[in-house]
Amino acid sequence: MLFSDLTINDKEPIYVQIKKYLEEMIAKGLLPHNSKLPSTRELSLILKVSRNSIISAYEELKSEGIIYSVSGKGTFVN
């Protein structure tokens, strides 16, 4: 399952690790254009991390134009 192979370490902030992981999955084509990402709440439960870490990772990816959000619909790969 996607996201099950992410191992969180203490070497860098959690949100940075999540951001890098998502960038890799997108680059490899495992998260194709316009595919819906899990909600921040759902992904925080899957990864067993703070929802704020997911929000920070998503915000950074949005600011770089890698993902986008549609109000009431979710977050998608750009």
Task: For the regions a language model picked out, list residue spans one by one.
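N-terminal basic, amphipathic alpha-helical segments
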Residues: 1-78
